[in-house]
Swiss-Prot record:
NCBIfam families in the record: PRK04164.1-2
Chain ranges passing through the membrane: 25-45, 67-87, 93-113
Keyword Ribosomal protein in record: no
Species name: Methanoregula boonei (strain DSM 21154 / JCM 14090 / 6A8)
Keyword Membrane: yes
A Pfam family that the UniProt record links to this protein: DUF2179
Protein name as annotated: UPF0316 protein Mboo_0791
Protein family membership: Belongs to the UPF0316 family.
Topology class, membrane: Multi-pass membrane protein
Protein keywords: Cell membrane, Membrane, Transmembrane, Transmembrane helix
């Protein structure tokens, strides 16, 4: 058996190695861990937790009963890890601040992600002056959307109400067309949870399709 006596007396590590060891030791001192590293991890965990909570509620409202439980599973695991870290350090205010700021920022980030996902269908009600809604009806039919037109009476005379069920990610394009071709039209948009049937059957959407299209969409140059 060979015995390694180690470095000879008077041996010194290279300066670069000494510096790396010093930085590593500094990063893992108790004060750095308790007041910076662990609070940052709790902050990030809380952002992820609240984002998942927001998306889970959205998926439940859209009737996605298989995807919502999967998100709930990971959501509760992350929440338990974060809350255990806070409860084990009740005397450290950094943990409370990290948890609170993570909750606030996670709410905002979750709403932004939900908006980018553009999940599900919406119902559009468009009210135009009598005879001026034919262009909107033709446009919706060209986009493979069914329309229901009703003659009604408004405060200033006859109007036409156009009702159509459209994909949520198509709403910006449709509203832009309405504002350009019929700026005087009034329209409202409501979420729809379930669709049974119609003239044009809606296609099943991948919940991440809208988000991917948003990322891939070319941005305008200033």
């Amino acid at each position: 058996m060979q015995f390694n006596p180690g470095p000879p007396a008077g041996f010194h590590a290279p300066p670069a190695k000494q510096k790396a060891c010093t930085v590593t030791f500094f990063l893992f001192t108790p004060d750095i861990l308790n007041y910076i590293v662990l609070p940052v991890l709790i902050f990030l965990a809380q952002i992820a937790n609240v984002c998942m909570e927001t998306l889970r509620i959205v998926f439940l409202s859209k009737g996605m009963k298989y995807l919502a439980p999967v998100i709930a599973f990971f959501e509760i695991i992350i929440w338990l890890l974060a809350i255990v870290g806070v409860l084990n350090n009740l005397s450290n205010i950094a943990y409370f601040l990290a948890y609170a700021f993570g909750f606030a920022l996670g709410t905002y980030v979750g709403l932004v992600i939900e908006e980018k996902l553009s999940i599900g269908m919406v119902i559009m009600r468009i009210i135009t002056t009598d005879g001026s809604g034919d262009g909107i009806t033709e446009y919706l039919q060209q986009e493979n959307y069914g329309t229901t037109c009703l003659d009604a009476k408004g405060a200033r005379g006859g109007v036409k109400m156009i009702i159509s069920l459209v994909n949520r990610d198509d709403v910006p394009r449709i509203t832009r067309h309405i504002e350009e071709t019929n700026p005087g039209a009034f329209f409202s948009i409501e979420d729809v949870r379930y669709v049974n049937q119609g003239v044009f059957r809606p296609k099943k959407q991948n919940p991440f399709t809208g988000f991917i299209h948003t990322l891939a969409r070319p941005r305008k140059r200033v």
